[in-house]
Curated annotation (Swiss-Prot):
Gene: hook1
Listed name of the protein: Protein Hook homolog 1
Biological process annotations from GO: cytoplasmic microtubule organization; cytoskeleton-dependent intracellular transport; early endosome to late endosome transport; endosome organization; endosome to lysosome transport; lysosome organization; protein transport
Location(s), subcellular: Cytoplasm; Cytoplasm, Cytoskeleton
Described purpose of this protein according to its UniProt entry: May function to promote vesicle trafficking and/or fusion.
Pfam families membership: HOOK (PF05622), HOOK_N (PF19047)
Length: 715
């Protein structure tokens, strides 16, 4: 039997593949999800198995047993409703499939029952002819199994079994009535077909009769017209007699056919009466079948009531046993309630302690955060102070350089003033000599220079060489100035980088000292606490601090290497760097001494605070001391900023003075050039003078103009 059911399941799976659903339906595991079956039902009757119902079927269920079970339940419920409401057939006589076995065990027997119900829906819907034709195209073995399943469904839908003995006669009567009904329906179809044929023959004969009657009328007319036709001796009479004989034969045949038609009509009426009787009998049998179904439903209800009564009796027995055990459970319940009360008190006390610990931890975290922020601010302010100190040193060096330049310019100004006075005196003497007529051009005293005795070519070459020497000297001075500025910029960059690295180095040393202090504190805590449960946390914290310490040391080593790389090659810069290193070492020693004093004062403050109130947080004293240091640093920074601003103002004033001096010198130089050009244009200089004499003549031309004018007026 199980083999037949498995063959039935496999054949029905092959039949289900003809629907060409989107979901796979090749194996039993593919069908356990229910997606392929729901899509096939939607193709069978889209009006009942609608799109909304199809959307409720989950497709991606995977191995989820619950989702598969829900899908199969929805499909089975919809099929049963389809049989009851659309096909008007009760499914009480058909064993419904066990869906749990289908989902969990992939049972082919139960799956075959479900597929058999789907097959019944297909062969009983509006498109049953199409699906029957599809079944006929399958293989013979599959077709035979599918037809057997259809016959089983058809046999089960006829009548339902009532019980044991009285149901046998009714079943036989129903089977016999169904056989008679099928025979009568077949005979009815044959008689209807025969009636159609006879009707066609009657119509043909009536047409022939009408045509013959028309011919008969024509012949009677002709017979009336031609009385000679009555004479049989004439050929027309013989023809008339023959036609009359044929007419009589046709009339007899017509009468015979009408009699046969009447006989067939009577026989058809009798068959219709028999069909009406059989329909009444079929209605009676269907009413009996409905009564049998209702009786079977009542029998099933009574059986379920009896089963329920048995279950209730068993449950009553179990409840009695449970009531017997209830007293023990109550005693245990009381004991558990007492334990629960004790546990509740313990939990309340522990929660209070935990709340206090959390509050203390939060306060400690805030203090730690404040300390870290203050450390960060201190490092930033110290870096800023170092930068300001470096800027101040730079400004001081610039100031010293400007003071030296000012002294040099003042010395040069004094020398120029002296030369100017000498030139004025000589000019005054020359003017007096010219006025007195004692100073004549071309005299031996005027040509007292050795250069004037040289030829003109040598003088021109000498002048050109002097000009080239001057230009080369100017180019060399410009290149030396550019080189000096580049070296000064490199020195400033090196100093700035060194100061930055020094500040970073100092901050890293401070951080290392703090980390070492924290490591020592943690080691002391580990030694004091011994085997407490939070040793792992302290060890992790110690390891983290050690890692930070190693990183800080590595960073210091890298910055030391950078400092070594930034050592200048020039001797002057090396000397200055040595001086700066000495000053830096001195500052480092001062900083170490200050740090030692700070640590000593900090330890003393901690001891005092602990001695006063051990419950207070030790971080508050550190915070206060750091705040004091920050305020001192702020004051120092403000003072340095003021000094820096004053130095900038002094530098700006010195720059203004220098620019005014340079502008004045440029104006004097322009005036001299203009006087030279005007002198050459007027050709006032005699051709026999030397270059220096020409220069003196050009420079003194303007001054002599003011003296010559009043002299000429007096003459």
């Amino acid at each position: 039997m199980d083999l037949k059911k498995t063959v039935l399941c496999e054949s029905l799976i092959i039949w289900l593949q003809t629907f060409k659903t989107a979901a796979p339906c090749k194996t039993v595991e593919d069908l356990t999800s229910g997606a392929a079956m729901s899509q096939a039902l939607h193709q069978i009757d889209p009006s009942w198995f609608s799109e909304s119902w199809l959307a409720r079927i989950k497709e991606d269920v995977g191995d989820n047993v619950r989702l598969k079970m829900n899908n199969l339940k929805k499909i089975l419920q919809m099929i049963v409703d389809y049989y009851n409401e659309v096909l008007a057939q009760q499914m009480s006589d058909f064993p419904l499939p066990d869906l749990m076995r289908v989902v969990e065990q992939s049972d082919q027997v139960e799956l075959g029952r479900l597929l058999q119900l789907i097959l019944g829906c297909a062969v009983k819907c509006d498109r049953k002819q199409e699906y029957i034709q599809i079944i006929m195209t399958l293989e013979e073995s599959v077709q035979h199994v599918v037809m057997t399943a259809i016959q089983e469904l058809m046999s089960r839908e006829s009548v339902s079994q009532l019980g044991a003995e009285p149901a046998g006669d009714t079943e036989q009567q129903l089977k016999k009535a169904l056989e008679d009904l099928t025979e009568v329906m077949a005979e009815k179809e044959e008689l209807a077909q025969r009636c159609q044929e006879l009707d066609m023959q009657v119509t043909v004969l009536q047409e022939e009769r009408n045509s013959l009657l028309a011919e008969n009328d024509l012949l009677t007319d002709r017979s009336s017209q031609l009385e000679t036709f009555d004479d049989p001796s004439t050929p027309s009479g013989r023809k008339h007699s023959q036609l009359q004989f044929q007419l009589e034969q046709l009339q007899e045949e017509n009468f015979r056919l009408e009699a046969a038609k009447d006989d067939y009509r009577i026989h058809c009426e009798e068959l219709e009466k028999q069909l009406v009787e059989l329909q009444h009998r079929n209605d009676e049998l269907t009413s009996l079948a409905e009564e049998s179904r209702s009786l079977k439903d009542e029998l099933d209800i009574l059986r379920s009531c009896s089963d329920r009564a048995v279950k209730l009796e068993a449950s009553v027995e179990t409840y009695r046993k449970k009531l017997e055990d209830l007293s023990d459970l109550r005693r245990q319940m009381k004991a558990l309630e007492e334990k629960n009360m004790t546990y509740m008190h313990n939990t309340v006390s522990l929660e209070e302690e935990l709340r206090k610990a959390n509050a203390a931890r939060a306060q400690l975290e805030t203090y730690k955060r404040q300390v870290q922020e203050l450390h960060k601010k201190l490092s930033d302010e110290s870096r800023r102070a170092d930068n300001l100190v470096f800027e101040m040193k730079k400004l001081q060096e610039k100031y010293d350089a400007l003071v030296k330049e000012r002294e040099r310019i003042s010395i040069e100004r004094d020398t120029l003033r002296e030369t100017n006075e000498e030139l004025r005196c000589t000019q005054a003497q020359q003017d007096q000599l010219l006025l007195a007529g004692k100073y004549q051009t071309g005299s031996p005293s005027h040509d007292n220079l050795a250069a004037e005795m040289l030829p003109i070519e040598y003088r021109e070459k000498f002048i050109r060489l002097q000009h080239e020497n001057k230009m080369l000297r100017l180019q060399q001075e410009e290149s030396e100035k550019q080189r000096i500025t580049e070296l000064q910029q490199q020195l400033e960059e090196a100093r700035r980088g060194r100061s930055q690295l020094d500040t970073d180095n100092r901050l890293n040393r401070e951080r290392i000292s703090e980390l070492q202090q924290q490591v020592e504190d943690l080691q002391k805590a580990l030694q004091t606490q011994g085997a407490k449960p939070d040793d792992s946390h302290l060890k992790r914290k110690l390891d983290a601090h050690m890692v930070q310490l190693n990183e800080a040391q590595d960073e210091i080593m890298k910055k030391k290497e950078l400092l070594e790389d930034l050592q200048p090659d020039a001797t002057q810069t090396s000397v200055k760097m040595d001086e700066l290193m000495a000053a830096l070492k001195k500052k480092d020693e001062d900083m170490r001494a200050m740090e030692d004093r700070y640590k000593m004062y900090l330890e003393k403050a901690r001891d005092v605070i602990r001695a006063l109130d051990p419950k207070l947080n030790p971080a508050s004293a550190e915070i206060q001391s750091l705040k004091v240091q920050l305020s001192d640093k702020d004051k120092k920074i403000i003072a340095l900023e003021r000094e820096c601003e004053q130095a900038k103002l002094r530098e700006y004033e010195e720059k203004l003075i220098v620019t005014a001096w340079y502008n004045k010198s440029l104006n004097f130089q322009k005036m001299a050039i203009e006087s030279r050009l005007s002198g050459r244009a007027n050709s006032l200089v005699p051709p026999g003078q030397s270059f220096l004499a020409q220069q003196r003549q050009v420079t003194n031309a303007r001054r002599t103009m003011s003296i010559n004018v009043p002299a000429s007026s007096s003459k």
